[in-house]
Amino acid sequence: MKILVTGAKGFVGQNLVANLINIQQGKNRTRPALQIDEIYEYDITSTPQELETYCAQADFVFNLAGVNRPKDQSEFMQGNFGFASTLLDTLKKHGNTCPVMLASSIQATLIGRYGESDYGKSKLAGEELFFAYAKETGAQVLVYRFPNLFGKWCRPNYNSVIATFCNNIANDLPIQVNDASVELELLYIDDLVEEMLDALEGKAHRCNYDGLAAQAAADGRYCYALTTHKVILGEIVELLDLFK
């Protein structure tokens, strides 16, 4: 099997690629059904020709590329919708209808505090693009709406409140909390990677959404990781303070 990972140098991409390499090299034997021949790592420094080659040969695509902290709000749509369009167009060009996974966000629900999120709007546009692609080509698409992620190799002050809080407390920096009563849904990176490996084996967990909550459904439109943790923001700060 040849696997394309876009956004391979990002937080999720690094963790996924490391696990794929361990499986490929026989260091991780928990997935004996997976036979990995090639891992194509595509990121911002990769060339258009590399994308052409990878899209022509891939048996499965993890699309993790995206923009979280743009200099301008318009970059959300360009980075999250624009590249997704380029990726799918390139797959179509080569007649490759392999399964494609999309890393979306819970912000794509545009519910509550996410209602005016430009990031969420760009992710929702990417989702609709993928669903239209599936209808047009018959390819399987697996759309995951990630909640708040945390774990190793996560950058502070970027896309994880946990990484930011840990960094600030470790370095005696102040923590800013606007509303300590906010409930967060957290997903640990290793739990996410296990779900992504399930998807690679054809065992993705399907769901539909009732507001912000994933509801298991065998024929669900979306996919999700089973193990998440719901916590109050203020309680996270109190817990981390205990490590000082």
Say what each PLM segment does.
Residues 85-127, 132-137, 141-142:
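Conserved Rossmann-fold NAD(P)-dependent oxidoreductase catalytic core, especially the SDR/UDP-sugar
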Residues 45-82, 86, 90-94, 107-114:
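NAD(P)H-binding glycine-rich loop region in Rossmannoid oxidoreductase-like domains
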Residues 156-164, 181-202, 234, 238:
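Substrate-positioning beta->alpha
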Residues 198-244:
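Mid/C-terminal beta-alpha module of Rossmann-like enzyme folds, strongest
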Residues 1-26:
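N-terminal Rossmann NAD(P)H-binding glycine-rich loop of SDR-like oxidoreductase domains
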Residues 128-153, 167, 173-182, 219:
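Conserved beta-loop-beta element that borders a ligand/cofactor-binding pocket
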Residues 6, 61-65, 100-106, 144-146:
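SDR active-site strand-loop-helix element
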Residues 116, 147-157, 179-187, 222-229:
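Glycine-rich "substrate-gating" loop/helix at the edge of Rossmann-like oxidoreductase active sites
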